Each structure stands twice: as structure tokens, then as C-alpha cells.
């Protein structure tokens, strides 16, 4: 089966003549197939150079004709220009073209007009898409390989928006980021707009968290829309990263920046569930205070357990307070905290990988709550900018209890701060102030 590709400048009369000859061959020969590529005149030179370079060809004029050994996309064998194609058609098929010059010029004009119209329609189509733009930093992290497919889950974002993914990373190579982009395209998801890879190797010290997120904040301030929403997740300095973004994007509402505590909250629920011999999903309303990746405090004052096999049983929906079901106070004060601090590291040491699945699940839980209608009774923990709630110093990004209503979060005011909790909150605040001062010192020294 003969498979040919015909490419040329859209306004080239010889491309028009070759196109007509190819149509005649395809119409009369059952095994002859042609694929046409009309290229805008302004783009032709660059397109031709790139095509020839990638295939090892030498050709300098329009049109360009080659034969593919398998279906379009396979290895190509250069045939040449118009004269070569005409000679090939005469020699192999006994068919030639007798198109006159004035008709060639007329068809060339029509080709150019058609190409311009198609380009205008494509521009209009892209403008009318209005995709939801999602930027992912550290896109080469294993978490992203798990996260990206789930971003297209129905119900995660209100409506079914077209998603435009922007993948950024400074720790790997441009080739690795390009490979991730190719894998994303291979998902073949209709709601995926063309993903973009944004590789940046300008930073000399990629491990400098302060420098890194100081710059990210400036980029958000300069380029992002004012209703942008930013979720910070990770294993180190999460509160500080979120704080730096807020400081360097002053025109963006600080409520649009949050640090993810959910993974830590779920890990606490897992330890409690194992202690009570229930499923993790049977534990709810666990509150995490403080520094998400540092000194934090697990508050169980509102925590509930469902389907607990104890002396008191009830129907579906019946719950009991976790604090009343756990009688081992020594375990809560010692082993519980120790297990929680080691949990993520234990998993990573066994798999030699980051905790990608649980991190992905936590990110999706917050995205779903933040972008949809959630029950105002459900308690989440979230790192947000303090305005002095619960006596926490204003200006610190601090994990505290929140609830989501109509796509917005609000701090829960119905939480009691005991004397013991106050001591823990003060200790967390002191550590966060130290991290903030450290970041400020780093930025000052590098200025």
C-alpha cells in the first residue's frame, strides 16, 4: 500500500498542482493514500528545516513529498519536490498533470485563504475553551504521576471544565519533564487541553527553599489571576513555603493560599483506628494544630468513632467520642505521637519511594472540598494565615480546624483551647517564628 505525505507552502502553485495530481491518484488507485500538510508561508522555512533535520533529508523548496513505509507516523523515505513526484507518478502509474499556470495560481490562492480561515477558526476555538489552568511545581515528584490522572475525576471541580496542565520542575532535566508531558497526553482524556512543560534551571541553589518559594510568590503576583487558588503540599517546611508565597503575592487574597494538613490528619486517624480495631474511615474530626512538617499537636476533642465494637452499639450513623473509647492515656501521650512521627518515614523506607498514594488522596480531598459544596459540620485541618484566632500570633501560617461551605473555608470558632492545648500552640508558634526568621535571613543574605 502506497502512503505518501505532501507538504508545502499554502500559497505555492506547485503545491497546488501536486495536490491535484495526488487527488487524481488517490481517486483512481485503491492502494494509493495521500496526507496533505499545508504550511503557512511565514512558517514554511522553519518547518522545512526542522522536518529535514529530524529525518536526515536535504530539501530547500516547496513542495516536499515523502513516502512512509507504514501508517503515517512511521519512517519516511524522501521522494523530493514537485518534479520528482510528477516523474514518480508518470513512471509508476502512467498518470501526469496538465494543469495550466493560471489554474495553479488560482488554486494556490484558495489554499492560502482556506489555511488562514482554518487558523482563525482554531484561534477562536482555543479562546472559547476557557480552560481551568492548573500549575504543578515539582512535577517530577512521584506524587504527580499518581495525581495527574485523578485531576480529571468528575466532581473534583465544579462542572466539567477543560483542564490545562502546566508542569514545572527544577530538580530534573528538561527531557524528563518532556517525558511526563508525553505520558500525560497518552492518557487520551477528552477534557485535557494541551499540557505544557515549564523547565527552569536558572536557580543556582535548588535546595534553598526560601529562594525557591520567594520567586514562586513573585511569579504568582505577576502572572496569576486574582482568584487563583494555591495548595501547598510536601514533607518539609510546608507552613514556611505557604507563608513565603503569601508575602510575595500581596495583591492575592491570603485566603486563597492553604497548606495541606490532610495527609497528616489521615495518618493520625489510621493510628487511632488500629488502636480501636475499626477502619480509618470510621474515625472523623481529628484536628491537627501547628507546624505541619515540624512541631504539631493532635487534638481529639471533637474526634468521633463510628461502628466501634464496644459495650454501647447503635444504628448506622451512631458515633462515640474517641477520647471516651481509648482508656490507654499513656499510649496517647507516648506511643501515638511516636508512631505518627515515624509513620511516613517507615513507609518510604520499605518502598524506597515517597508516599505518593496517600499524598494524592489528601490533595484530592482538599480540592474536592474547596471547589464543591461540603457539609459545614465536617471538620478539616488546614494550614492558613492566622489573624489572631485562638491566641495564635497573626501573620503565621498555622494548621487549625476549618470547615468548607460553598467553595470557601472558614476557621471553626467552636473549638475549646484548654491550658494544655495552649502550651502546645505556643510551642508550635515559636517554631514557626524561627522558620520564618530563618527564611528572612536567607533572603537578606542572598539579596
Curated annotation (Swiss-Prot):
Enzymatic class: oxidoreductase
Q: Output the Gene Ontology terms for molecular function.
A: L-malate dehydrogenase (NAD+) activity
What keywords tag this UniProt record?
NAD, Oxidoreductase, Tricarboxylic acid cycle
Q: What is its EC number?
A: 1.1.1.-
Do you know which InterPro entries this protein is assigned to? Lactate/malate_DH_C, Lactate_DH/Glyco_Ohase_4_C, Malate_DH_type2, NAD(P)-bd_dom_sf
Q: Which domain of life does the protein's organism represent?
A: Eukaryota
Q: Name one Pfam family in it.
A: Ldh_1_C
The answer to whether keyword NAD applies is: yes
Q: Keyword NAD: yes or no?
A: yes
The record's annotation in Gene3D superfamilies points to: Lactate dehydrogenase/glycoside hydrolase, family 4, C-terminal (3.90.110.10), NAD(P)-binding Rossmann-like Domain (3.40.50.720)
Q: Name one GO biological process term.
A: oxaloacetate metabolic process
Q: Which family does it belong to?
A: Belongs to the LDH/MDH superfamily. MDH type 2 family.
Its name, as the record gives it, is: Putative malate dehydrogenase 1B
Q: Which organism is it from?
A: Danio rerio
